Amino acid sequence: MRSLVTACASLWAVILLEIPQVRCEMKEAELNMAPWSFDDQYSGCEDRMAEKISSTGLLETELNNDGKFKEAWQKAEQTWGERKRNGTIPALPPGFTDEHGIAILVYTGAFYYRLNEAVRWVGVSPQDYMETFPYKALHYYLTRALQLLEKNCFGGCQTVYRGAKNIHFTPSSGKGSTIRFGQFTSTSLKKDVALFFGNDSFFTIKTCLGACIASMAALVTENEVLIPPYEIFNVTNFNKDEHTFVLTSTEMRCSNYNCTYLGGGKPNACGHAGKKPSPWFCGVDSPGWVPVVLGQC
C-alpha cells in the first residue's frame, strides 16, 4: 500500500510539473507628470464639443468601429434607463445628461482598462489623438461627468484609497515629487475596499477634483470616487519598502491639451492659479514613464 501511495504521489508530482504555471510577475512603474497622457479638460468648448459629437455622429461611428465598446455602451444604456425608471439615481447637477451617466457605467463596468490604456499614451501629439484615439466621445462624456459632479461631491476635498497588485510604483523624485495619474483613476472612500484590489502598492489620497460616482457606478457597493487625469498631487509620504504612498492634492490641474477635437493645440506653458475652476496647462519637453492602471495580469 505504501509503495502504491508513493507511486501515486510521484505521478501527481510529474503531472503538476507538466501543467503550465500561471504567475504574475511584479511590474515596476514610475509616477511622474504623465507627459504622454491625453488630458483634455474641454475648457471653454464644453457645449461646442457636445454639438460636434452630435452633428458628426462621432459616438455612433466609434461604437460601430469597436464591437466591445458598442456592447459595453448598449449594456450601460440599458442599465441607466432601468435605474432612472426605478428612481435609484440621485439628483443630478444642471447639464448632466444621459450620455454622462452612461459613460460612467461604461467605464466602471468592464471598459476602464481599454480606455485608460489608450488615454495614457495617445497624448504624444494632436495628430496621434485625431488619428488613433478610438474613444473621443467617451473621453469627453466621462470628463464632463466628473467636472459636473465634482462640485456636488464633498463640498471640498476628501480622503480616498487605492490599492494595486502585481506592481510597485516609485515616485520620480521620491518624497516631495509632483505627480499626476494621467488616467481616470478609481479610488474608494473605504480602505478595506481598496485593499481588496491589492496592496503591492497602496495609496492614501487627498483629492479635491475627484467625483463621487458610487450611486452611478456599475458596482454601487465600492463607494467609488473617480479622479480625473489632470489633478496634480504632491507625494507627501512614500515608504519604499512597503510601496505605500500619501498623496495630497495641490488643488490645481494641469493639461497638455484643450479642445483638441475642435482644433485646439498644445499650450507651451503650465500656469498654476490656485483653486480657480479654469484649467491650467503644462508644457512637456521630455518623455516619462506613465503609470499602469492596476498592474493586474
What do these predicted ranges mean?
Residues 174, 199-200, 216-218, 259-260:
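Short coil/turn segments at secondary-structure boundaries
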Residues 2-23, 293:
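N-terminal Sec-dependent signal peptide, specifically the hydrophobic helical h-region
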Residues 24-51, 56, 258-277, 282:
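Extracellular/luminal ectodomains of metazoan preproproteins built from arrays
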Residues 275-297:
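Cleavable C-terminal sorting propeptides in eukaryotic secreted/cell-surface proteins
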Residues 59-211:
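Internal glycine-rich, Lys/Arg-flanked active-site/core loops of soluble domains
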Residues 219-274:
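Compact beta-sheet-dominated globular domain cores
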Residues 203-220, 228-232:
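Conserved short secondary-structure elements within globular domains
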